[in-house]
Amino acid sequence: MKIGDKLLKQLNKTYTPSVTIPLKFGRYDLIIKTDEYGNPILLFIGKANEEGIIKGERFSRVLIKDPDGKVIKDHWDNKGKV
């Protein structure tokens, strides 16, 4: 599975720092974990069961910035099934 442009637009937003956020995106359930700055760094996408646990795929974000805050690297890696 690939992350599409519409989902990337949703993931490039800034959220509340250091939280787990459940979302719906089309027919998929998402759980986003954010870092201390509110950037999404972990994504679980698939179908949630009645306990809210996602069965699908896990993505991890590589976000590297220089000391001035300019983004050097920013991409999502598929880490496999969950």
Regions found by a protein language model. Give the residues of each.
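Extended, compositionally biased eukaryotic interaction scaffolds
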Residues: M1-E51
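Short, compact, well-ordered microdomains
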Residues: K55-V82
